[in-house]
Amino acid sequence: MKTLICGPMYSGKSTALFQRLERFLFAKKKVLLIRPKKDDRGYFTHSGGIDLDKLEKNNPNFVILTLKDIDESDAKSIANDGFDVVFVDEYFMIPGAHHLCHQDDYDVYFGGLLADSESELFPETIKILPYCDKIKKLNGVCIKCGSELGNYSFAAFDKKEKIVVGDTKYECLCHKCYKEAQHEKKINKEAE
């Protein structure tokens, strides 16, 4: 089974991944967590309290890999290593993560943003969506008005900037506040 857990920042994607990961460890399954090399936040979820290094050290069925990208041979190697389930945190930052979809030897849970600040799907999102048996879309909370159904915005920053997970320039906004921010950004750009 292939599952995608997506949503805006601060919606609980990594926490949802971890809850599922814990269940598999409790069931004594062999679990692999793949994290992107680009993610240097130093924590797994905003809610804290999760020490992945300690969990890996104390559990012989749990392995963490930090990867820059994934190719087809990596996906096959994971199958050969006997993993029952693979979790990919911030999948959109790992080119080739979609290769994991082509293996039937293990279940895969992808977690991360669905789209960029302009609501354009990430290339990896486009490649994994057709293979996902389940898609769980989580909602965030708008940092401006507090409503649910978050969207994405770089506020006053240039779209050309790369998204860095946990970046303070990245905001979770509802559709109304997102449109207002886009309008304000346009006015500021015209004033320059």
Report each predicted region and the residues it spans.
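Catalytic P-loop NTPase motifs of RecA-like helicase/translocase cores
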Residues: F92-G96, S117
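Sensor-1/coupling segment of RecA-like P-loop NTPase cores
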Residues: H102-E124
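Short, cysteine/histidine-rich loop/knuckle motifs that typically chelate Zn2+
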Residues: K144-S147, K176
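Conserved AAA+ ATPase "SRH/arginine-finger" region at the nucleotide-binding site
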Residues: K134-I143
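Conserved P-loop
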Residues: M1-A75, D116-K127, G140, Y152, ...
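Structural motif
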Residues: L4, V85-F87, Y109
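Walker B catalytic acidic pair
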Residues: D89-Y91, G112
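Residues at the starts of beta-strands that form the adenosine-phosphate
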Residues: K29-K30, D107, K134
